[in-house]
UniProtKB/Swiss-Prot annotation:
Species assigned in the record: Saccharophagus degradans (strain 2-40 / ATCC 43961 / DSM 17024)
Subcellular location: Cell membrane
Transmembrane spans: 6-26, 29-49
Top-rank taxon: Bacteria
HAMAP family the record matches: UPF0391 (MF_01361)
InterPro entries: DUF1328 (IPR009760)
Pfam families: DUF1328 (PF07043)
GO cellular component: plasma membrane
Upper lineage: Bacteria, Pseudomonadati, Pseudomonadota, Gammaproteobacteria, Cellvibrionales
This protein's UniProt keywords: Cell membrane, Membrane, Transmembrane, Transmembrane helix
Name of this chain's protein: UPF0391 membrane protein Sde_0270
Amino acid sequence: MLYYSIVFLLIALVAGLFGFVGIAGVATGIAKILFFVFLIAFVVSLVIGRRPRV
């Protein structure tokens, strides 16, 4: 589960880099949306991964 958290974080950082720096140009809005979607997915996977297994 930690692997997926790291993957979500890296994807969010890349999407944010392209969206906020302006490299993507037209896709800036999409990159911002993807940044927040993957950032939320990262936080959720961190919380779920910390639960004790029953």
